[in-house]
From Swiss-Prot:
UniProt similarity note: Belongs to the fimbrial protein family.
Protein name (record): Fimbrial subunit type 1
PANTHER family, sorted: FIMBRIAL SUBUNIT ELFA-RELATED, FIMBRIN-LIKE PROTEIN FIMI-RELATED
Biological source species: Salmonella typhimurium
Classification via Pfam families: Fimbrial
Cystine crosslinks: 46-86
A GO CC term assigned to this protein in UniProt: pilus
UniProt keyword terms in alphabetical order: Disulfide bond, Fimbrium, Signal
SUPFAM superfamilies attached to this UniProt entry: Bacterial adhesins
UniProt keyword annotation of Signal present: yes
Gene Ontology BP, a term: cell adhesion involved in single-species biofilm formation
Subcellular location: Fimbrium
Chief place of localization: other
Signal peptide: 1-22
Amino acid sequence: MRHKLMTSTIASLMFVAAAAVAADPTPVSVVGGTIHFEGKLVNAACAVSTKSADQTVTLGQYRTASFTAIGNTTAQVPFSIVLNDCDPKVAATAAVAFSGQADNTTPNLLAVSSADNSTTATGVGIEILDNTSSPLKPDGATFSAKQSLVEGTNTLRFTARYKATAAATTPGQANADATFIMKYE
């Protein structure tokens, strides 16, 4: 009997102790990281969509044998810049200029480079064209054809392609970066 009483007392104390531990956990706080918030308020006719602000246009892979003369080009690859919340009463049109490192031999093209330590292709640059197929020099001052704005969302369409700057090309990475400037009138 005494053994049962001791066993039941020990069991009761264990339940009370377990409940006390479970009911009163000590909170722990630790720094988890940093979140960067970026944005901009603009006094303009439209706001550039966040999906258009930073984008990658994949031009593809081409054989060097495809470029046999200066001026040879690859297929045009479409891309667009989406404008949101447009108010055509503020400005009736929008145009875009691109700015980037110009090719040394053909300054109306973007110079190509490699993002890492890999070999950079030579004899080729990247050409950007507007919706009228007019080439846009990457000088930040050559604007695309004006597009009339409608209220709400507007899409400005462009294409890009590789263009030979020499009669012979060499293989390697052929990447370029360009920023774009909006002009509303």
